[in-house]
């Protein structure tokens, strides 16, 4: 008599499951590295939006003032540019901790009206933009 049983044996199924488990164990650590890199890139992109929005609002204010006027950025009512306005223009959901704007120095080096530093935090990642930073930390953006 012929035995016409079709299908896999229990041993074959267990072997396949073990192989899949080994492959998953090898891939999961690599994937978490890619996920972290993607999160870093996302916070850098949002920080760039904040820098561009900051520079836009600072330029608008600076253009209306006398040459060499200082621009202040903050949450106080005395600030020329409000952080809430920057956040609204940048369309970001994170927290803008600080925005610094350069001033004209007595040595002739001028960064007046240029956003020189931005600190932005979102989803546990903090990105710091520094003007003229050249140490290779993702351009002028350093994520921690």
Positions of PLM-derived features:
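N-terminal single-pass transmembrane signal-anchor helix
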Residues: 4-32
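Extracellular/periplasmic head regions of type IV pilus-like filament subunits
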Residues: 66-130, 134, 143-144
């Amino acid at each position: 008599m012929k035995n016409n049983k079709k299908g896999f044996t229990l041993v074959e199924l267990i072997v396949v499951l073990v192989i899949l488990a080994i492959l998953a164990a090898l891939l999961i650590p690599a994937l978490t590295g890619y996920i972290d890199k993607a999160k870093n890139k996302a916070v850098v992109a949002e920080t760039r939006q904040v820098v561009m929005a900051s520079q836009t609002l600072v330029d608008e204010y600076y253009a209306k003032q006398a040459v060499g006027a200082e621009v202040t950025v903050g949450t106080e009512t005395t600030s020329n540019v409000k952080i809430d306005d920057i956040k609204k223009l940048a369309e970001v959901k994170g927290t803008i901790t600080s925005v610094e704007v350069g001033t004209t120095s007595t040595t002739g080096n001028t960064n007046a009206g240029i956003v020189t530093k931005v600190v932005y935090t979102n989803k546990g990642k903090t990105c710091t933009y520094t003007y003229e930073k050249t140490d290779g930390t993702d351009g002028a953006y350093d994520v921690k």
